[in-house]
Structures are given as C-alpha cells and as structure tokens.
C-alpha cells in the first residue's frame, strides 16, 4: 500500500502550487507520485466539478452541494486513489474529506454526523496518512484567488470565491479546529510567506518528520 497525503486550505492559500512543488521534490528523490484533485480527478468527477464551481449555479442547496461532492469523491476514490495506493504510489490530493467538513459542515451549517456519514461512504473508510494545512488570512487568500481567476483561461470556477467573508472565516476556523484535534495527522504551515519559503517548510516536515518515521514502506 502506498502513502496518502492531502492538501487543505481556504481559497487562495497556495495549496495547488505547493502540491505540485512537493510532487516534483518527491519524484526527484525517486518516489512514484500520483497528483490529483477534488472535486475532480477523473472524467466523471470533473463533470460534477463543473457544476459545483460554476458561479451561475448559486442556487445549489447546501444538501445538494454535499451530495454532489460525495458523488464526485466516491468515483475519484474508486477510480484513481485506491488503485494508485495499491500500486505503491504516494498520492497527493488537492482537497479531500476535510474540505467537506470545513466547507459544507462549518461553512454551510450541515450537521457533522451527516457529513461524516457521507464522507465514510464516499471514501470507503479511506483516510489520509498525512494532511498539509496551509493557513492564511482570509482577505489575503481571497485576493490571491481573485487574481488567479482573472488571469486564468477556461471556465471561471469562482462560486466559492464569491461567498461572504464570514463564510470563509468559518471555513478557516474549521480547518484549524480539525488540525488541533488531530495533530498526529496534520502539518499546519503558515501560508503568508513566499512560495519557496512555504515549499521548503512543507518538504522538510513531510520528509523529516513523517515519511522517514512512518511505518509505511515507501520504496
């Protein structure tokens, strides 16, 4: 079995950039790495992603949103993540089940037990071995996210960026609470620094504190 690392953070935290940098670093050290994302990661889940992130779909109810995320995750786990882990890869995933607890649980106010039940079903009880939380101020993150959207080509995936500041503050607080509750699984990194500085902090902690001391064989 491989090793499963997830990246979490609010909009504009820089996790997508950092997951790519960690992947490159691990590959340079000889590890076999699969990088993926949620929502999405495979053809069916990418179609669900287009619904979830399209700002024109602002009328999606919280429960519909939760169920769509669960459906996308169920397909992604079955088609991509579990097969990659069985092949012995390190899987790096941009968002996973913690995002649902933060966004749909805390942000949307859906009861924790409902989110937990759907997460367990969609994940087939799979849990990350390690989660990297990149934390940053909400205003800073949203400004970064909006700049990215304005310069990106393709569909404008901005439904969550258009939410009120209070929504994003609730999501950030939920992430910090999750990290506090499971310090053995979470690495929390300050996302306010430069890209290289953040990358060095993540690589150092992943390699020195986790991979070298884990019971998982990463050969």
Curated annotation (Swiss-Prot):
Binding site for ATP: 9-16
Name used for this protein in its record: Thymidylate kinase
InterPro entries (UniProt xref): P-loop_NTPase, Thymidylate_kin-like_dom, Thymidylate_kinase
Upper taxonomic lineage: Bacteria, Pseudomonadati, Thermodesulfobacteriota, Desulfuromonadia, Desulfuromonadales
Keywords of the record: ATP-binding, Kinase, Nucleotide biosynthesis, Nucleotide-binding, Transferase
EC number per UniProt: 2.7.4.9
Family indicated by similarity: Belongs to the thymidylate kinase family.
Function statement: Phosphorylation of dTMP to form dTDP in both de novo and salvage pathways of dTTP synthesis.
